[in-house]
Amino acid sequence: MQVLVRDNNVDQALKALKKKMQREGIFREMKLRGHYEKPSEKKAREKAEAVRRARKLARKKMQREGLLPMKPKPVFGAGPGAGRGGPAAGPRGPR
């Protein structure tokens, strides 16, 4: 995998490399290959992933058909940290 470094901007090149690796699924594969996974565990994990995908597809289909309410869009400034320390406050209070 190659990434061009323009104007000695290594940070930008590193960001592009990480994005490519994420798209290719390299990080996920490294995590899975970090330790041995028994064939039975692999089968169970893949089955659970398939069930999750099927549920997600069914949920999206029901939302499109109007049988389920759509997920509310996040409103900035009205989240869990609103009113505690200004705009820089996150979920754990002011910085």
Curated annotation (Swiss-Prot):
GO cellular component: ribonucleoprotein complex; ribosome
Upper lineage: Bacteria, Pseudomonadati, Pseudomonadota, Alphaproteobacteria, Hyphomicrobiales
UniProt xrefs under InterPro entries: Ribosomal_bS21 (IPR001911), Ribosomal_bS21_CS (IPR018278), Ribosomal_bS21_sf (IPR038380)
Sequence ranges of Gly residues compositional bias: 78-88
Keywords in alphabetical order: Ribonucleoprotein, Ribosomal protein
Family recorded in the similarity comment: Belongs to the bacterial ribosomal protein bS21 family.
Entry's Gene Ontology BP terms: translation
Keyword Ribonucleoprotein among UniProt keywords: yes
Record-linked HAMAP family: Ribosomal_bS21
The organism's place on the tree of life at top rank: Bacteria
A UniProt-annotated Pfam family: Ribosomal_S21
PANTHER family: MITOCHONDRIAL 28S RIBOSOMAL PROTEIN S21, SMALL RIBOSOMAL SUBUNIT PROTEIN BS21M
Species this protein is from: Nitrobacter winogradskyi (strain ATCC 25391 / DSM 10237 / CIP 104748 / NCIMB 11846 / Nb-255)
MF term (GO), any: structural constituent of ribosome
Region (Disordered): 56-95
UniProt entry tagged with the keyword Nucleotide-binding: no
Gene3D superfamilies the UniProt entry points to: Ribosomal protein S8
Protein name, as recorded: Small ribosomal subunit protein bS21
